[in-house]
């Protein structure tokens, strides 16, 4: 009876709102070699880029991933070239020597800005590839071909 009362009392109360967390879904894809697929559903702006980056980093570390495909097709990217350079530097400083490959799957309208990100990260030691073609991204991330360092 006490349990019923407790439920009834708590049923009408609302929990305090949580701070907005980036919606990052992760799945380990069991190919040879395996990779971590992350799907991001958030608007990426100057204000949200650090929390989004931290959420992605947490998933990579939690899964011990060496290859990561980040699907940004359900996100909107509203970053300046300067912001993209900042993200590239953060990515390299966190994952140079850790990630073997990083693929970004983006909407066609976001491809131009992400193509700036690709060489910025790759030149800092994290092989990166940006595309709007899902098959191309999956092929590249799972490829066994050794990349030049």
Regions found by a protein language model. Give the residues of each.
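Amphipathic, Lys/Arg-enriched alpha-helical "gate/interface" segment within cytosolic domains
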Residues: 2-149
């Amino acid at each position: 009876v006490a349990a019923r009362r407790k439920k009834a009392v708590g049923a009408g109360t609302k929990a305090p709102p949580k701070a907005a967390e980036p919606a990052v879904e992760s799945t380990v894809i069991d190919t040879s070699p395996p990779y971590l697929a992350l799907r991001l559903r958030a608007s990426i702006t100057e204000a949200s880029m650090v929390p989004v980056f931290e959420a992605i980093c947490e998933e990579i570390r939690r899964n011990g991933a060496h290859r990561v495909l980040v699907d940004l097709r359900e996100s909107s990217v509203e970053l300046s070239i300067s912001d993209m350079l900042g993200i590239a530097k953060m990515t390299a400083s966190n994952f140079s020597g850790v990630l073997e490959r990083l693929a970004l799957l983006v909407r066609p309208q976001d491809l131009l800005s992400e193509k700036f990100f690709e060489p910025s990260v790759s030149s800092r030691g994290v092989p990166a590839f940006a595309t709007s073609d899902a098959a191309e991204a999956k092929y590249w991330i799972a490829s066994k071909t050794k990349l030049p360092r």
